[in-house]
Amino acid sequence: GVNMHQDHAGVGSAIPDALQAWRIKQLKKFGCNAYRASHNPMTPALLDICDREGILVINENRLMGINEEHLRLLERMIKRDRNHPSVIMWSDGNEEWGLENTIQGTRLAEAMREYTKLYDPTRPSTVANAGGTELIKGLDVVGFNYIVQNDVDNRKKANPDWKIVGTEETSGCGTRGWYFDTPEYPGRMISINRTDKPGVENVIERGWKFYDERPWAAG
């Protein structure tokens, strides 16, 4: 699967429907069968395409929160998209660093999870987690961004009933070359022109291998 932004070279975020369909077909050629909307709800036309093409979707809410506006946006996404068969899970947010290690984060995740179930009791909720230990306690499915930021094995050992999905594992920051032996950034992707050193913690092949070896986790 992939995390995809509503963005494409030459057109920006105003992607024509035909180009959306082309992108999905290219992903299928790679063997891709899942799509996480990052980090906002997908355009309805793209969901229609995923329905037709058999792509599994994690549809993502833009911001975590329980004030009137936060809940209005969450409700709008669910009501609009809940009849799409491609949607398998709702993501209530992404990498809320300020909340992930707090009891407030746990309570917020629980509240959003229960609010989501008011409008769709058939699908689970997740949040893409960047390494915290508290917010994830309030989720139906625990989403882990980057295995190097999350002690996934020990978390599962301590919480055997957890349902786990790898929600994000790498970023395509390099230009053309992949380097694994740079002393300053061992095991990371480095731009071929060496003008930039993106702080990317992992490469996708390692993530694939990690989740493939663990039948209790998807990713």
Feature names for model-found ranges:
Residues 21, 71-75, 148-149, 201-205:
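Structural motif corresponding to alpha-helix initiation and N-cap regions
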Residues 39-42, 130-131, 145-150:
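Short beta->alpha connector loops
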Residues 23-24, 77-78, 130-131, 151-155, ...:
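Generic recognition of flexible, low-complexity loop/linker segments
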Residues 54-62, 141-148, 163-169:
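Short hydrophobic/aromatic-enriched beta-strand-loop microsegments
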Residues 86-90, 109-118, 125, 136, ...:
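Substrate-binding clefts and catalytic carboxylate motifs of secreted carbohydrate-active enzymes
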Residues 1-114, 125-126:
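Active-site-adjacent substrate/metal-binding segments within catalytic domains
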